[in-house]
Design a protein with these regions (language model features):
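Recognizes the extracellular SEMA beta-propeller fold with strongest preference
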Residues: 1-211
């Protein structure tokens, strides 16, 4: 590890960096940041590179940490001494994915933005793929699951936002009541000048969401 850039490995071969194949930094719009708080778990099978970790308290009042790798997902007990393989039946396959995690009504939901969005309704089983549009970004807002940069019907909509009904993260039915809906940041019938508008993430402030 470089003494000039604490936390960012610059002078070790990528093969020696177990939890990040030469990429232990993450890129977000306008910044580059190091993955703070991520340490090597010796119990990860085959020293699989870790891309993200999410700790939460389940409905059974127990703390768990979901450990996301390129092609595997594990659940660790609070003390990190035991783990369970919760990889979905169709495993994720994208290398260097940016994983995201949200809790909607106590339901853990995660995605790598490429292969699908998964839920974990039963802590005794593997992750289950959700029948909702694929999205590169997601956020919990007022108990609704918000999706950004959406893919629907094999078409990609970089400027589209979808939101579910409250406490129903799998119900995206568009209704006049506005409880489930969709918004596009570019006009589908426009002149094309807005085509560069792309959703890059969400932010919450009180009861508002910033895109």
């Amino acid at each position: 590890q470089s003494t000039n850039n604490a936390g960012i490995v610059t002078n070790i071969p990528s093969t020696d960096v177990v939890w990040a194949t030469g990429k232990n930094v993450r890129f977000k719009p306008g910044c580059v940041y190091k993955t703070l708080g991520k340490t090597l778990l010796a119990t990860v099978p085959n020293s699989t590179p870790i891309r993200a970790m999410f700790t939460f308290r389940g409905y059974d009042n127990a703390f768990r940490t979901i450990v996301c790798c390129d092609k595997k997902v594990y659940s660790y007990a609070e003390e990190y001494t035991t783990y369970t393989d919760i990889t979905p039946s169709t495993a994720p396959s994208y290398v260097n994915a940016i994983w995201q995690f949200e809790l909607i009504g106590g339901l853990p939901i995660l995605t790598n933005g490429v292969n699908g969005i998964w839920k974990w309704p039963s802590f005794g089983s593997v992750l289950q793929k959700m029948s909702i549009p694929l999205a590169k970004y997601m956020k919990n807002s007022m108990h609704r699951l918000m999706l950004g940069h959406v893919t629907e019907g094999s078409y990609e909509y970089p400027s589209r936002v979808r939101w579910s009904k409250s406490a129903q993260p799998e119900v995206f039915t568009i209704g006049k009541d506005g409880k489930g809906g969709r918004a596009d940041f570019i006009k589908m019938t426009g002149d094309g000048m807005e085509s560069q508008e792309r959703i890059k993430g969400f932010g919450n402030f009180k009861n508002r969401v910033f895109v």
